[in-house]
Regions:
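Conserved catalytic core of the tyrosine transesterase superfamily
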Residues: 1-330
Length: 330
């Protein structure tokens, strides 16, 4: 194999296949790039293997497993991050197997590497009282306060990922017979999520205040920071932290997403609808919320048939039985 084959395959995978054919998001692409950047770093620093000498066969199971161990032990990555890196590598080898069947054996060996079991993280979410407290904190009479309130309401009302919020354009908001927002999620898959009347009113007011109703503004980003630039994830997280309910040190956009899902579930919304609102591909992902809600489990048990335990009688002493038991002792 020529020394340029690996570089050629990796370039085609990252620059053409993932963004153009698969249509992955920028965040997914960045994650895949990080996986291979770290792998090349490991090869050079730990194995003394220059990038120009790396081939498909060079990336043996032993080398990949060494890389994964290096991530956990030296780089202090979590088991979850380790598994994400492995997933990116496996996806590349599936691509390589399809592009060049000559390397099917080398690819299959990598695909057999198992993921590492990791503890199930505690699902953090806010109660209805806490989300109410949070939404009451911004001052809607100021420009920043109004914008911040809109951000909080959109994240909670739609259950959107932070990347979906940041990608929203004016044209993604629809006010017809019922208000709704079009979100673009993982794999560039779009979905429409209904908006509550109060969030819709906030949006109408915001669009009017910002002069965003003209046709030429439809492709403009909906929410910008004070400098008129795109928000970053860190910027949105900072806003959430500023209005965090009492007793919560760290609030992230994903906690609001979890909160919306749990509140829908607790309100009796069918889990299939919750899956569609959140944009999950696999309903098993949505079922995580059902497993996490201990209060719902308790109520379900209370509503079920009671365990038919018979009434316990009163123990009556039997002198003959006691005498017989004593006779068994030496």
């Amino acid at each position: 194999m020529r020394t340029t084959d690996f570089a050629s395959l990796l370039s085609k995978y990252l620059l053409s296949y993932l963004p153009c054919q698969r249509g992955v998001s920028d965040n997914t692409l960045a994650s895949y790039e990080a996986a291979f950047s770290r792998l090349l770093q490991y090869c050079e620093e730990e194995r003394g293997l220059p990038v120009r000498k790396i081939t498909v066969e060079t990336l043996s199971p032993d080398l990949i497993e060494g890389y994964l161990n290096w991530l956990c032990e030296k780089q202090k990555n979590s088991a979850s991050t380790r598994n994400q890196r492995l997933s990116a590598i496996k996806a590349f080898f599936k691509f390589t197997r399809r592009e060049n069947p000559r390397y099917i054996y080398a690819c299959e060996r990598i695909l057999q590497i198992p993921t590492k079991k990791c503890p199930t993280p505690v699902l953090r979410y806010l109660s209805y009282e806490e989300i109410k407290e949070m939404l009451e904190k911004p001052n809607p009479c100021t420009e920043k306060g109004f914008r911040d309130l809109l951000i909080l309401c959109l994240l909670y009302d739609t259950g959107a990922r932070v990347s979906e919020l940041l990608d929203l354009t004016v044209g993604d908001i629809h006010f017809g017979r019922y208000a709704r927002v079009q979100l673009t999620g993982k794999g560039n898959k779009s979905r429409e999520v209904p908006l509550s009347a109060k969030t819709a009113d906030l949006l109408k007011n915001y669009i009017q205040r910002q002069n965003l109703s003209s046709p030429e503004k439809q492709t403009q980003q909906l929410i910008l920071n004070s400098q008129g630039k795109s928000f970053t994830r860190a910027g949105i997280t900072y806003i959430l932290q500023k209005y965090a309910p009492d007793g919560h040190k760290k609030i992230t956009p994903h906690i609001l997403r979890h909160t919306k899902a749990m509140h829908l579930l607790q309100s009796g919304v069918n889990i299939v609808y919750i899956r569609d609102i959140l944009g999950h591909v696999d309903i098993k992902t949505t079922e995580t919320y059902a497993r996490a809600d201990t209060e719902m489990k308790r109520k379900a048990l209370e509503q079920a048939y009671p365990t038919p335990v018979p009434r316990q009688g009163t123990w009556q002493s039997d002198s003959k039985l006691m005498d017989w038991l004593k006779s068994l002792s030496p």
